[in-house]
Amino acid sequence: MRAIRMLLVSALALGTVTAYAGEQDVQRLTQLLEKSQTIEANFSQLTLGADGTSLQETSGKMTVKRPGLFYWHTDAPQEQVVVSDGKNVTLWDPDLEQATIKKLDVRLNQTPALLLSGDVSKISQSFDIASKEQGEVMDFTLKPKTKDTLFDSLRVSFRKGLINDMQLIDSVGQRTNILFNGVKANQAVPDSKFTFDIPKGADVIKE
C-alpha cells in the first residue's frame, strides 16, 4: 500500500508524436486538470520493483473534487480507505481497525493526488514539465524541482481530455502504474462523500 500512500499523502502505438516544451506544457496540463472539477473512476494498480518484478496488484474506486477533496477505496484483500476533506487526510485500515489522521499537505510535490483535485495554478513552481502528444493521448512528465519529495518523477496521461493513467517512480527505481477506467467527469458529488465516520472502538492515531 506504500504506493497509494505516496500518491495520496501524491506495445507502442502507431501515429504521429508531437513534443512540446516550456510554458506551453504548463498551460496544456493546467487546462486539462482544471477542466474536470470532479472525477469518478475505477482504478487498477501495479507496483514493479526496479528489476521489473511485480510486487503488488490492487484495484478499487476513487472520487475527487476540487478543491482538495478525494476518496480512494482499495478493494480487499488489501482493503484501505483514504479520504481528504480538504483539511485533513484519514487513512482507514479495516484489518487493523485503525484510523490515521494527518493534516493535508497541499504541496503538489508531496501529495500528487492533488493534481486531480487541488489548486494547480502554480504547478510550474513545483515541477519541471514536459509533454508528448500521440494521437488522442497526451502524456506529461513531471519532475520535482526539489529533492524533499516522495518520488523522482510522475507521468500523467490523458485520453480524449480525461485522465487515463499515472506512473510514479521513486528514488530506488520502484514503479507504480495506476490505470483508470470508467472515468466520469464533472458529475454532481456531495461533499459528504469526503467525510469518513470512524467506527466505534477503532484505534485512532493523529500525526
Swiss-Prot record:
Localisation per UniProt entry: Periplasm
Keyword set, alphabetical order: Chaperone, Periplasm, Protein transport, Signal, Transport
GO cellular component entries: outer membrane-bounded periplasmic space
Signal sequence extent: 1-21
Alphabetized CDD domains for the sequence: LolA
Disulphide bridges: none
InterPro entries membership: LolA/LolB/LppX, OM_lipoprot_carrier_LolA-like, OM_lipoprot_carrier_LolA_Pbac
GO biological process, one term: lipoprotein localization to outer membrane
KW Signal (keyword) present: yes
Quaternary state and interactors: Monomer.
Family statement drawn from the similarity comment of this UniProt entry: Belongs to the LolA family.
UniProt-listed PANTHER family: OUTER-MEMBRANE LIPOPROTEIN CARRIER PROTEIN
Function: Participates in the translocation of lipoproteins from the inner membrane to the outer membrane. Only forms a complex with a lipoprotein if the residue after the N-terminal Cys is not an aspartate (The Asp acts as a targeting signal to indicate that the lipoprotein should stay in the inner membrane).
Protein name per the record: Outer-membrane lipoprotein carrier protein
Source organism of this protein record: Pseudomonas putida (strain GB-1)
